[in-house]
Amino acid sequence: MSQAVGNVASIRRKLVIVGDGACGKTCLLIVFAKGKFPQVYVPTVFDNYVADVEVDGRRVELALWDTAGQEDYDRLRPLSYPDSNVVLICYSIDLPDSLENVMEKWISEVLHFCQGVPIILVGCKADLRNDPQVVEELRAQGLQPVSQAQAQEVADQIGAVDYIECSAKTGYGVREVFEAATRASLVGKQGKSKPKTKSSKKKKCVVL
């Protein structure tokens, strides 16, 4: 849950969250910004929230930009990227394909529109990693929930500044995600580390 700050925040930062549809992005934002877990899944088109966060003695007004992960919105989603200070790339721990798409789709899109902007990889739905039903359903497909080691390897490959797991349903790790994101947004753009991907061509934040 976001930490309320009495005075008006003197620092403003923009956070954009991306990832496959239904991977848990919107629930994560709602739990942090509003303190409640939505019981009904409604696919996001675009939505914005604002949360006041205090980290390391600094007050920050964090604008939270939610996006749609469905392919239908691939041409519209880039409108959210300009002026971003930090990007959360999310995947769902119970959906191995969603982690594969971090490498296959999301990192190249983020690098294309937001060169140098700090990236945090977020593993959503951590409560499902050991859920018996989820484990059994994945086993029937020859799969298993994503392990921390697998996700950390992807985080390293894409040049993420951090990897954090969370569960919007239980509240586990939610505050840590946004505190880490706020700190990363205050550091500013990076120019030293390059993600180990085929997409080496990057552009500044632009709008299609």
Curated annotation (Swiss-Prot):
Disulfide bonds: none
Propeptide: 206-208
Any one GO BP annotation for this protein: small GTPase-mediated signal transduction
Cysteine methyl ester PTM sites in chain numbering: 205
Record-level GO cellular component terms: plasma membrane
Location of the region described as Disordered in the Swiss-Prot/TrEMBL record: 188-208
Motif annotated as Effector region, chain positions: 41-49
Annotated membrane topology: Lipid-anchor
Annotated keywords: Cell membrane, GTP-binding, Lipoprotein, Membrane, Methylation, Nucleotide-binding, Prenylation
Main location (coarse class): membrane
Lipid sites, type S-geranylgeranyl cysteine: 205
UniProt KW Cell membrane keyword: yes
Localization: Cell membrane
Entry keyword annotation includes Plastid: no
Compositional bias ranges of the Basic residues kind: 191-208
SMART domains: RAB, RAS, RHO
Residues the entry annotates as binding GTP: 19-26, 66-70, 124-127
Signal peptide positions on this chain: none
InterPro entries the record matches: P-loop_NTPase (IPR027417), Small_GTP-bd (IPR005225), Small_GTPase (IPR001806), Small_GTPase_Rho (IPR003578)
GO molecular function: GTP binding; GTPase activity
NCBIfam families tied to this protein: small_GTP
Family the UniProt entry places it in: Belongs to the small GTPase superfamily. Rho family.
Name of the protein this chain belongs to: GTP-binding protein Rho1
Organism: Kluyveromyces lactis (strain ATCC 8585 / CBS 2359 / DSM 70799 / NBRC 1267 / NRRL Y-1140 / WM37) (Yeast)
